């Protein structure tokens, strides 16, 4: 692939790691953020200490606070901003674009209020005149491992398979590999909802439960994620792939996962506001729990784990009681899809 110019919007842990992957592949990478001190640090010291204490970035990676400069004459734009500001940043990009680009996103969540997936937001805010079909980059991927060039396999999903193949070539190298998919609904739904199950898995650990319980919540969590995804129009096979069970395993079993750590702290009795303050990072699983619960209620989809976590976070229920209540739910077949 010829050298591409790429703007990466969001210099958080994942945005920074993906910027390095793209830089390793010989592309011109521009990181954009709105924290002046962080941008200056990246440009001057070639570090991003808030997220990576011992990592030095390539000096060719340039960082910007001016969005217009960051996206000027680029071939593609990668959104890696928190869900809650995706629409705002997309509006800003739409007002500045002067030519057609490939639009990608690598965030995982659902918009509060509208319940929309992130690709839908980007489609609504950025005119087709200036973009390809949206490409979703998602899968089992800790930034802490990708940044040290550990082997990572994820998915590039788009309704336009050629756009997905472009992104596949853009990122893939000897340690980072992408597989294509056209099931955008499934890939985005899996990526968002696995954060809820990771909170639950972390809570089980914090409460002192063992591997049996953790395996159960991950497996039954996958079942309810799939149930909702299918109701939304997803291909059930997607949930057995990298962006489904793969992402759920890596997020639901690892201390690298901020959602798992948040659940662990909840299980140990910490208050949510203290957890969010101490972590200093967005915990997408918290807001996604509310959105997923509301969607499930609207569509009458059975999601007991999501409901239990929702009641603990938003209704003040005891997390242990909520989990134990699930053990007395009505008996069901393992393969029920409603």
Swiss-Prot record:
Residues of the active site: 194 (proton acceptor)
Single GO molecular function: NAD binding
The species this protein was found in: Streptococcus agalactiae serotype Ia (strain ATCC 27591 / A909 / CDC SS700)
Binding site for NADPH: 13-14, 108, 143, 258, 282, 284
Entries under Pfam families matching the protein: NAD_Gly3P_dh_C, NAD_Gly3P_dh_N
Family under the similarity heading: Belongs to the NAD-dependent glycerol-3-phosphate dehydrogenase family.
Coiled-coil region: none
Lineage: Bacteria, Bacillati, Bacillota, Bacilli, Lactobacillales
InterPro entries (UniProt xref): 6-PGluconate_DH-like_C_sf, 6PGD_dom2, G3P_DH_NAD-dep, G3P_DH_NAD-dep_C, G3P_DH_NAD-dep_N, NAD(P)-bd_dom_sf
Reactions catalysed according to its record: sn-glycerol 3-phosphate + NAD(+) = dihydroxyacetone phosphate + NADH + H(+); sn-glycerol 3-phosphate + NADP(+) = dihydroxyacetone phosphate + NADPH + H(+)
CC per GO annotation: cytosol
Residues noted as binding sn-glycerol 3-phosphate in the record, renumbered to the chain: 108, 139, 141, 194, 247, 257-259
Biological pathway: Membrane lipid metabolism; glycerophospholipid metabolism
Broad class of enzyme this protein falls into: oxidoreductase
Protein name: Glycerol-3-phosphate dehydrogenase [NAD(P)+]
Keyword entries, A-Z: Cytoplasm, Lipid biosynthesis, Lipid metabolism, NAD, NADP, Nucleotide-binding, Oxidoreductase, Phospholipid biosynthesis, Phospholipid metabolism
Gene of this entry: gpsA
Cellular location(s): Cytoplasm
One GO term of the biological process aspect: carbohydrate metabolic process
